[in-house]
């Protein structure tokens, strides 16, 4: 193998392993966040049974669905997240060669910053094209509040993908894709762009104390998450439309979804579950730091 191929493989492995570990750890927070986001678009959750907030959700889930239900959809998330994060990190470095080739970060700061934004955004958008159906399935499985058996909308990952494909075709698995691309570019641009720029401005980036790296990563994930959160809420709502027919369809399209959420629920609705997203972001920050640490030994 060439040095470039070895480097690509190391990026793929280091990024994927770090992501799988952290995602499993924060899966309960992830499910709470998703339920708060999509409950208004769920056929299973009637108005009188909607969750009032994070704590209400945390208390009711184990009582109504069992403790293990906190990890509902986690398998799809791990399967999805491994290639997503690994491809993001791997492609990010490839895109950096394109956007940052010959750029001096000390004398051309803004060009360096813009290049990092572009490479991070392009990496995220490229990866999304490959793994979106898994992201879709993860959302629908996590939003399934049935206790067991017939009460469940889907029996598992395979059942979800098959049922939606039968009812809506492959297109159904890509519901909300356009707004997802918009959101992922914004999120990844900040996630990678600001982090790499901040680390690049340190005197000795490769030997930075892990606490400093974590603090930078934590700030980056919080800002990136909040900035792109409304896009995430809209895409999750659109995902809930697949499999519906006639009067059951709540939104005719992405723009209609934006309008109805703002009109019927208010602007705050775009940020439902955002606080749990910040907590979940600690896992994202851990991924960035762990990725850097793993690369030191590979």
Swiss-Prot record:
The modification Phosphoserine is found at residue 7. Residues 38-74, 131-178, 232-273 are mitochondrial matrix. The modification N-acetylthreonine is found at residue 2. A motif (Nucleotide carrier signature motif) lies at residues 235-240. It is found in: Mitochondrion inner membrane; Membrane. The modification N6-malonyllysine is found at residues 23, 92, 96, 147. GO terms for biological process: adaptive thermogenesis; B cell differentiation; chromosome segregation; erythrocyte differentiation; mitochondrial ADP transmembrane transport; mitochondrial ATP transmembrane transport; negative regulation of mitochondrial outer membrane permeabilization involved in apoptotic signaling pathway; positive regulation of cell population proliferation. ADP binds at residues 80, 92, 235. The modification N6,N6-dimethyllysine is found at residue 52. SUPFAM superfamilies: Mitochondrial carrier. The chain crosses the membrane at residues 8-37, 75-99, 110-130, 179-199, 211-231, 274-291. The modification N6,N6,N6-trimethyllysine is found at residue 52. Pfam families: Mito_carr. Residues 1-7, 100-109, 200-210, 292-298 are mitochondrial intermembrane. InterPro entries: ADT_euk_type, Mit_carrier, Mitochondrial_sb/sol_carrier, Mt_carrier_dom_sf. Its main location: mitochondrion. Trimethylated by ANTKMT at Lys-52. Residues 235-240 are annotated as: Important for transport activity. The modification N-acetylmethionine is found at residue 1. It catalyses: ADP(in) + ATP(out) = ADP(out) + ATP(in); H(+)(in) = H(+)(out). The modification N6-acetyllysine is found at residues 105, 147, 155, 163, 166, 268. GO terms for molecular function: ATP:ADP antiporter activity; oxidative phosphorylation uncoupler activity. Monomer. Component of the MMXD complex, which includes CIAO1, ERCC2, CIAO2B, MMS19 and SLC25A5/ANT2. Interacts with AK4. Interacts with TIMM44; leading to inhibit the presequence translocase TIMM23, thereby promoting stabilization of PINK1. Belongs to the mitochondrial carrier (TC 2.A.29) family. ADP:ATP antiporter that mediates import of ADP into the mitochondrial matrix for ATP synthesis, and export of ATP out to fuel the cell. Cycles between the cytoplasmic-open state (c-state) and the matrix-open state (m-state): operates by the alternating access mechanism with a single substrate-binding site intermittently exposed to either the cytosolic (c-state) or matrix (m-state) side of the inner mitochondrial membrane. In addition to its ADP:ATP antiporter activity, also involved in mitochondrial uncoupling and mitochondrial permeability transition pore (mPTP) activity. This is ADP/ATP translocase 2. It comes from Tachyglossus aculeatus aculeatus. The lineage of its organism: Eukaryota, Metazoa, Chordata, Craniata, Vertebrata.
């Amino acid at each position: 193998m060439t040095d470039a191929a070895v480097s690509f493989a190391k990026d793929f492995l280091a990024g994927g392993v770090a992501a799988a570990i952290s995602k499993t750890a924060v899966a309960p927070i992830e499910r709470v966040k998703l339920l708060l986001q999509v409950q208004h678009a769920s056929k299973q959750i009637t108005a009188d049974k909607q969750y009032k907030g994070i704590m209400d959700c945390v208390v009711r889930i184990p009582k109504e669905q069992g403790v293990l239900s906190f990890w509902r959809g986690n398998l799809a998330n791990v399967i999805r997240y491994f290639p997503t994060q690994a491809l993001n990190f791997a492609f990010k470095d490839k895109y950096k060669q394109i956007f940052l080739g010959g750029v001096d970060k000390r004398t051309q700061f803004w060009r360096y910053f813009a290049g990092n934004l572009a490479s991070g955004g392009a990496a995220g958008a490229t990866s999304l094209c490959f793994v979106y159906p898994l992201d879709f399935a993860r959302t629908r499985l996590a939003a399934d509040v049935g206790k067991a058996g017939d009460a469940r909308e889907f029996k598992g990952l395979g059942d979800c993908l098959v049922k939606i494909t039968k009812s809506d075709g492959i297109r159904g698995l890509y519901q909300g894709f356009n707004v997802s691309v918009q959101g992922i570019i914004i999120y990844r641009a900040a996630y990678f762009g600001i982090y790499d720029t901040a680390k690049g401005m340190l005197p000795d980036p490769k030997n930075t104390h892990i606490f400093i790296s974590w603090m930078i990563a934590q700030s980056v994930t919080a800002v990136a998450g909040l900035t792109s959160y409304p896009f995430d809420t809209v895409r999750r709502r659109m995902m809930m439309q697949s499999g519906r027919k006639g009067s059951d369809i709540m939104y005719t399209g992405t723009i209609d979804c934006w309008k109805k959420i703002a009109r019927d629920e208010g602007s705050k609705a775009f940020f439902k579950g955002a606080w749990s997203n910040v907590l979940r972001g600690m896992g994202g920050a851990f991924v960035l730091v762990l990725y850097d640490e793993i690369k030191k030994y590979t």
